[in-house]
Amino acid sequence: MSYLLDTNIVSETIRRNPNKAVISWLDQIPAEALFVSVLTLGEIRKGIEALPDRRRREKLRLWLEHDLPAWFEGRVLPVGLAIADRWGRLLAEVGRPVPTIDSLLAATALHHELRLVTRNAGDFDYPGLEVINPFG
């Protein structure tokens, strides 16, 4: 069983006071079963660059550029042709406007047969997608 982590799960790991249930859940899963999307890395970059505290921003830049790639080495999933195709089919199946990044994450999870792990389970109501909320 493998998992695609949403941005809020990855970000939780570097919070000053992370949610204990999330950390406990992550500790129980082998690292090789955890995946992230390049979209998550982009969302994290956006958040870091918007931080007003220069020292915190620099610390998190190092984490994003060094620690995070090491944690997910070989498990950062791109958005390529196959994901774009799965995304288009998913949007047609859903038949309603949906957020682009969330729906691309859903398509990525479905394409790779991963469970999506997020705090925002309600944002990922897509056919066939299994969603896990470790926040409890």
State what each model feature region is.
Residues 1, 106, 110-136:
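Acidic, PIN/NYN-like endoribonuclease modules and their adjacent C-terminal/linker elements
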Residues 1-36, 49-66:
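Short, well-structured N-terminal submotif of metal-dependent ribonuclease cores
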Residues 6-7, 22, 44, 87, ...:
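Generic structural signal for small/hydrophobic residues in well-ordered secondary structure
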Residues 8, 21, 85, 103-104, ...:
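Active-site phosphate/pyrophosphate-handling residues
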Residues 9-10, 40, 83, 105, ...:
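Alpha-helix capping/helix-boundary segments
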Residues 10-11, 42-45, 125, 132:
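Nucleotide phosphate-binding site architecture
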Residues 14, 26, 48, 91, ...:
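Short, flexible helix/strand-to-coil boundary loops that buttress conserved ligand/catalytic motifs
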Residues 46-52, 70-119:
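Active-site neighborhoods of divalent-metal-dependent phosphate/nucleic-acid chemistry enzymes
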